[in-house]
């Protein structure tokens, strides 16, 4: 099968590399290079670097419709997206001879939308997973083809869970695509009565409002990767970003007083200083 891949961040890399090593990937699409860091260095996204590593034709349009004339000239069976970062217009979805697919980091119909991993942790879910779905015009509403679950541990941060989901997807994708190649699959409509949404994380969400230990820990761990939850320490009069906490005492950790107990920040960054991660 000839495949076009569309994705951008590190989360997509293991799955895309597995697909590259087992199928005929004829093009890769990702977001444009961006300036990052304090020095604003122009940097290629991880998926762009992957395409260059394997000498696969790479396209980085500001808007994907810009490369519609190019895609129309290509002959491909599957169009697969994973954390690409743009909504794919229907005119492009219809170009694949077999299917246009999306790998989504939740067990749809739960957590449609922009932040399924963060919201699952924040809500205290104990399980999530990966869904391979046929893409539809409406975001994350397409028919489900395959799913695989993974446990969410109490101590998992967003980075931890992204790593679990990345491994899960990479381990499943060859079997899933082989089944599609051999027409050994079914497409199941999503149960609309069970749809939930994973709203984008907004700046107003980032401030820590100390609640119970459990709720505070979940929020901190959900926001740990990006952008990071913060509070204003009254003794220092500085903003402190908290990335990971423990319920048990850790030497040199920052003590956080919740409504029903204490948490200990083991990974944090005080405004104007470097990030600290305690063992």
Regions found by a protein language model. Name each.
Residues 1-38:
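N-terminal Rossmann-like dinucleotide-binding module
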Residues 20-21, 78-195:
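Donor/substrate-binding cores of folate-linked one-carbon enzymes
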Residues 34-52:
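N-terminal beta-loop-helix "entrance" segment that forms/cooperates
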Residues 65-75:
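Short amphipathic alpha-helix with an adjacent loop that forms part of the alpha/beta core around
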Residues 199-211:
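Acyl-group handling in specialized metabolite and lipid biosynthesis
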Residues 209-279:
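An anion-binding loop in the catalytic cleft
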């Amino acid at each position: 099968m000839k495949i076009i891949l569309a994705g951008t961040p590190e989360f997509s890399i293991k799955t895309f590399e597995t697909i590259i090593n087992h199928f005929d990937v004829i093009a890769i699409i990702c977001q444009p290079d961006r300036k990052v860091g304090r020095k604003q260095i122009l940097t290629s996204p991880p998926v762009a670097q992957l395409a260059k590593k394997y000498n696969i034709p790479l396209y980085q349009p500001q808007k994907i419709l810009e490369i519609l004339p190019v895609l129309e000239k290509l002959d491909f069976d599957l169009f697969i997206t994973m954390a690409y970062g743009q909504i794919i217009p229907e005119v492009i979805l219809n170009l694949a001879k077999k299917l246009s697919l999306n790998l989504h980091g939740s067990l749809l119909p739960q957590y449609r939308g922009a932040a399924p991993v963060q919201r699952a942790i924040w809500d205290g879910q104990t399980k999530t997973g990966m869904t391979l779905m046929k893409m539809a015009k409406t975001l994350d509403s397409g028919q489900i083809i395959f799913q695989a679950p993974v446990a969410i541990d109490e101590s998992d941060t967003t980075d931890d869970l992204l790593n679990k989901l990345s491994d899960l997807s990479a381990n499943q994708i060859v079997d899933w695509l082989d089944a599609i190649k051999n027409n050994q699959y079914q497409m199941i409509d999503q149960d609309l009565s069970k749809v939930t949404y994973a709203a984008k994380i907004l700046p107003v969400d980032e401030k820590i409002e100390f609640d119970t230990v459990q709720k505070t820990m979940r929020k901190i761990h959900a926001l740990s990767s990006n952008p990071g939850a913060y509070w204003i320490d009254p003794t220092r009069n500085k903003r402190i970003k908290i990335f990971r906490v423990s319920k048990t005492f850790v030497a040199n950790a920052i003590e956080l007083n919740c409504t029903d107990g204490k948490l200990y920040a083991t990974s944090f960054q005080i405004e104007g200083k470097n990030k600290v991660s305690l063992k």
